[in-house]
Amino acid sequence: MLKGGENMTTQIKKGFTLIELLIVIAILGTLAVVVLLALDPVQQLARTRDSGRYSSVTQLGHAIEAYATGNNGVYPTASTTWIDTLVAAGEITVAPGAIAYNVTGTAACGATNVQNGWCYAFTAGTGAIVFARLESKANINKCAAGQAAWVVYSTAAGRGGGVCTANATTYPTAGLTTFTF
């Protein structure tokens, strides 16, 4: 007999059984996998990098316009050191870092006027553009299948935006005034 007149068969057990604990762990594990798949950390990082590209392309575009304003409408020469020209002129204090393209199939533009992955095109009388390839699915899906998504700053339009081109080797052109997204 136990104290208080209880016998061993009526004693209440406190705590969880091993089976109950395993079921809870399995449910939590399943929820964790579902949440991880929904968040897709690779695409989260790609969207973050794309946001940085939007910002940098816009800043470079404004610097090009300021350079042209201070140089009687003449834009920087199209070369592999076009950003250094903006730094030397005092339009920006430091060249933006190189673009990190981490998603398979995404690469810098093939133009010859590329510095640190930032692309530049200039046509006399038409204006200049700064552009970079976008990599997140959220931006790529704004274009039709097989097309490439770019962030572009156009001096002809006086602003930046997203542009779709026929494919990854078709680049935006200077004088662009219409944006896809």
Spans of model-derived segments:
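N-terminal single-pass transmembrane signal-anchor helix
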Residues: 9-39
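Short, Lys/Arg-enriched N-terminal segments with co-localized hydrophobic residues
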Residues: 1-7
